[in-house]
Amino acid sequence: MDLLHAALLGLIQGATEVLPISSSGHLILIPRLLGWPDSGLTFDVALHFGTFLAIFVYFRKDVVSLVQDGLTGFFQPEAPRRLRLPWMIVLASIPAAIAGKTLEQPIEELFRSSPLMIALMLILFGLGLGLTDRYGKKLHDVASITLGTAMLVGCFQCLALVPGVSRSGITITAGLLLGLARTDAARFSFLLSLPIVFGAALLKGLHLLKHGIEPGMAMPMLVGVAVSAVVGYISVAFLLKFVQSRTLWPFVWYRVAAGIGVMALLGVGLLS
């Protein structure tokens, strides 16, 4: 893999992992359209680690506070909800962790060979995001999240295994559906992603330690990590600022247009 190829994949991952437009869908469709070879497990680890770094660094103060609150709340059974939030995030990550461990490979294999299904997921779940953004009550903030709300958002996160759904998209949709304000739904989505993205990178990293890094992949990995981390950080900052004063419908229209575009390419034989 050359460095330009690595940088482009890092750019795609950094933007689409964070924005509600589906990283897995883009990372399947774009290389397929351009005739790029499979990037392999080594590079996949690099991309996931890069986006984890982006989210972790952006929310570093929140992470420190969550750890402190979690340790305090653990020893206080009647602790305020704010002190229980870290444990809610951990518990809400369990459904997606189990689903990812058992279903990720068969789901990805199924959808990797079906651009049409990815296109349909882009459109369907994009419209779901738009409808919840328009009609959601938007009454609650992150501090008011209950365990039930957190677990429901965590269960919705399992759907992100399907390429075209989008992890951030489905968790923001769930948050809006359950009454979170738009900014708080996005913030909780990112906090909830940290255990999952870190866990995915860790498991694949352990696999690499066991089997070794492919020859010639060290520099492309570094480039992929750097680009996905920088672009991911910028994308987090952009999205959180964007949702303070704007709706999520621009992302909905993008998803619908992308889905229709994929169908058109399939129809004329430029994508198969």
Curated annotation (Swiss-Prot):
TM helices/strands, residue ranges: 39-59, 87-107, 113-133, 145-165, 188-208, 220-240, 251-271
Enzyme class: hydrolase
UniProt keyword Cell membrane present: yes
Protein origin, superkingdom: Bacteria
Primary location: membrane
A GO molecular-function descriptor: undecaprenyl-diphosphatase activity
Membrane topology: Multi-pass membrane protein
GO cellular component, one term: plasma membrane
UniProt-listed GO biological process terms: cell wall organization; peptidoglycan biosynthetic process; regulation of cell shape; response to antibiotic
Catalyzed reactions: di-trans,octa-cis-undecaprenyl diphosphate + H2O = di-trans,octa-cis-undecaprenyl phosphate + phosphate + H(+)
Keyword set, alphabetical order: Antibiotic resistance, Cell inner membrane, Cell membrane, Cell shape, Cell wall biogenesis/degradation, Hydrolase, Membrane, Peptidoglycan synthesis, Transmembrane, Transmembrane helix
Entry keyword annotation includes Cell inner membrane: yes
Family annotation (Pfam families): BacA
Catalytic activity, EC: 3.6.1.27
Location(s), subcellular: Cell inner membrane
Family the entry assigns: Belongs to the UppP family.
Additional notes on this entry: Bacitracin is thought to be involved in the inhibition of peptidoglycan synthesis by sequestering undecaprenyl diphosphate, thereby reducing the pool of lipid carrier available.
Main function: Catalyzes the dephosphorylation of undecaprenyl diphosphate (UPP). Confers resistance to bacitracin.
UniProt xrefs under NCBIfam families: undec_PP_bacA
The protein's name: Undecaprenyl-diphosphatase
